[in-house]
Design a protein with these regions (language model features):
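Charge-rich, well-structured scaffold segments of protease-associated domains
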Residues: 60-212, 219, 245-247, 255, ...
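His/Glu-rich zincin catalytic helix
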Residues: 1-62, 171-274, 313
């Protein structure tokens, strides 16, 4: 892996891989977290949609046609910490792919034409979001347990905030955060580093620097409590716990990840063993460390039946109390080393998958 930074501040991460395909991902620190700086919730996601509506030299139809001609797969995604644009092409079409996406990101038209139609699409996405029951459970949890953090509200905003958006709001967000020093492009290709750098400079080197940003993220402790919501279209019960992890050192974050492997991050973990293996009370039971900027949480997720809710939550609470008292978690060095090996393996598998 090689890394460099262009004169305009854009960072390039390169990995050579002998294959007939090339992949790239353009990541920008312009996710939903940046809406904390005086923007309507849903602005980041709506802007991602609108970038595909046309550029100063290409129409939406042009973009769609070229996408079909160039890419085996391409997409975009807005999360709390970032927005990404990515695609995979044949090696011979890599330059064409970069050309198209540089135009999409650097030269969006952001016109009023087509804006209302795209907002209708996002309104449909909002309805589908509400039908995703695990996501709905998490939304309810974050909304109730945080007072001010951006994760209190959905990434895509609400019906009210989406309805209040306009092109000027999107343009203001774009001009502030879509700047090269706020961005990174990663490339996996059979081309040499020098060839790749030349192409990235050709298509992104002219991306003008914006105003230097001093970015920060709001964190706060969660409010303790139990929050219950009845969904009429729901057969079973979704359960989620969250614990804040912000403010940890890198060594402490590593320790939490090792702990989580034993707690709920594997099929031999305490939660999985007690709730699923021994008692068969839940189909899904796991815990996860979420290290992303703006999240910094440990979450527990369970999927069970209505009649087993109290038993499942009782076991979770009992395990947590045992850990706090020092009675339930005393791993030896062999167990810690095994957890470390498994986490390394998972990371390698994740990285391998992300390059495909």
């Amino acid at each position: 892996v090689r890394k460099t930074t262009l004169k305009n501040g854009l960072r390039l991460i390169y990995e050579k891989r002998e294959a007939n395909i090339s992949s790239f991902c353009i990541g920008i620190d312009a996710g939903a977290l940046r809406e904390e700086d005086g923007f309507l919730f849903g602005t980041a996601h709506a802007l991602e949609h609108m970038l595909y509506k046309g550029t100063k030299s290409r129409s939406e139809d042009d973009i769609n046609r070229l996408s079909d001609e160039i890419f085996g797969f391409s997409n975009a995604m807005t999360n709390y910490p970032y927005v990404i644009y990515y695609g995979t092409t044949l090696a011979v079409s890599f330059e064409k792919g970069l050309d198209l996406y540089s135009d999409i990101i650097l030269n969006p038209s952001l016109k009023k034409d087509g804006f209302s139609e795209e907002m209708k699409i996002i309104e449909e996405e909002l309805r589908e979001w509400a039908d995703d029951l695990p996501q709905l459970c998490e939304d309810k949890l974050f909304r109730n347990c945080f007072k001010s953090r951006r994760i209190k509200e959905r990434i895509i905003g609400s019906q009210d905030t989406v309805a209040a958006l306009d092109v000027d709001e999107l343009r203001r967000f774009y001009e502030k955060f879509y700047i090269p020093q706020n961005s990174v492009i990663s490339v996996v290709t059979s081309q040499s580093f020098e060839e790749t750098l030349m192409l990235v400079e050709k298509y992104f080197g002219g991306w003008g620097k914006g105003k230097e940003l001093c970015l920060s993220t709001l964190y706060e402790e969660n409010k303790a409590g139990t929050y219950i919501d009845n969904a009429c279209n729901m057969e079973g019960v979704k359960i989620e716990y969250c614990f804040t992890l912000h403010g940890l050192t890198p060594d402490e974050e590593k320790a939490v990840s090792l702990f989580n492997f034993h707690f709920g991050g594997s099929v031999t973990s305490m939660l999985y063993d007690e709730i699923r293996t021994k008692r068969g009370l839940a189909y899904e039971i796991s815990s996860k460390v979420r290290k992303e900027n703006g999240l910094k949480l440990l979450t527990i997720y369970a999927n069970t039946s209505r009649e087993n809710v109290d038993r499942v939550t009782g076991i979770i609470d009992c395990i947590i109390e045992g850990i706090r008292s020092g009675k339930a978690y005393n791993p030896d060095m062999k167990q810690i080393e095994r957890a470390e090996d498994m986490l390394k393996l998972r990371r390698e598998l994740f990285l391998e998958k992300s390059k495909q």
